[in-house]
Amino acid sequence: MKLKEIALFNELAPGEAGEVEITGITSDSRAVQRGFLFAALKGVKADGAVFAADAAKRGAVAIIAGKDTAIADAGVPVLHVDDPRHVLAIAAAQFYGKQPEVMVAVTGTSGKTSVASFTRQIWAYAGFPAANIGTTGVFSPTRSDYNSLTTPDPVELHRVLAELASEGVTHAAMEASSHGLDQRRLDGVRLAAGAFTNLGRDHMDYHATIDEYLGAKMRLFNALLPKGAPAIIFADDQFSAQAIEAATLAGCDVKTVGRKGNFIALKRVEHERFRQHVEVRIGEEIFEIELPLAGDFQVANALVAAGLAMVTGVPAAAAMRALALLKGAPGRLDLVGATEDGAPAYVDYAHKPEALENVLTSVRPFTTGRVIVVFGCGGDRDKGKRPIMGEIASRLADVVIVTDDNPRSEVPAQIRSEIMAAATGATEIGDRREAIFTAVSMMQPGDTLVVAGKGHEEGQIVGNITLPFSDHAEVAAALAARLEEHLK
């Protein structure tokens, strides 16, 4: 592809510059190869302009940069633009070309992974070759690629979308994080519909205020969705009204789900230990659903996913039937096993205040004994949430064990102390493996254990090293050791 063939560059690269052949695109100078277009982006830790000369030496044939970015003596055309992140994403979309025919995106603080996964499963039930992209990876009929980035960078994203389309995927659901939206990573994705789950405290190390955080989320509706496109919004969150207003002002076709929903109205929920009986109204029809997942938040996620599926071609009755077959996303109230007495042990990705509150509230209805929680907070992230999560844990759980999460560059003991300051009666066990084994060993009949914070992750970040660690594997090992001891 020639540089001039990328629409945005027709005027930016006139004459000979436009005839340059582009063989690849990247914003990482270390990945540049001969013929690449390099985007010199300003980041939190580094300015891509510093690496422009190195990119040119490695073979970059043109450079994208901000209008206020000075790049001297690069030896290749430098294309100065108002929004280099947007231009990078659009260039990547045009370079790779193909996308699944039906693309949807879901934003919100919690539930994105589950909604994207559930939407894929409903589509698959209806006969569509479908995929989902997000925190746990890329999943389709031909692949299960695990990773840990909610919204991939635009070059990687558009490469994956092109591959999925080439593999026959026609429908794809993706997560839209506030970082991804703010950094224009989804620009160029041809979206058919979008969704909003909820909003709570998260990424306060990145967004200055909750209003700024909400504004980043709403970019899905006011910048990415075409006018008239369906916007599925969970109606029962404290920020639902703001989301509805933003989507309406953006010209979206707003459809709400939940107890206050006008598209899918939740009428009744009955909780059991591992499933829930749900009644919903769609138009004039009433549907009875046996949802094979625990937790009120999973009902919300399932309804948002059903809404997305219905506005993209799945009949209501088929979508409701599919809900009875849903499998939870990895690490989302994921039942690892149970003790010899039947007490269940879950792992959950809850690493934000509202998510921790949701999961602990969700297991209470089917817990006849104690709710036991093991959790910590990540280093180099929003410090303000630590005492908030400590208070939530001590208020909603009967036994609280505070441990290490991903301390990163911070001193683990300091992180724990900030949680413990508000976690009345909590026990502190820094070693996460020991904390999990301790929690499993104290379980009694009727108890429920939740190990929260890391969910599907397969490593623990200490300093700049990622050590192998899986909450799921450690809980399973602790349950096995307990059973072995019981059988002696």
From Swiss-Prot:
UDP-N-acetyl-alpha-D-muramoyl-L-alanyl-D-glutamate binds at residues 29, 150-151, 177, 183, 185. The gene is murE. Belongs to the MurCDEF family. MurE subfamily. This is UDP-N-acetylmuramoyl-L-alanyl-D-glutamate--2,6-diaminopimelate ligase. Its EC number is 6.3.2.13. One of its GO terms (cellular component) is cytoplasm. It comes from Brucella melitensis biotype 1 (strain ATCC 23456 / CCUG 17765 / NCTC 10094 / 16M). ATP binds at residues 108-114. One of its GO terms (biological process) is peptidoglycan biosynthetic process. Carboxylation is probably crucial for Mg(2+) binding and, consequently, for the gamma-phosphate positioning of ATP.
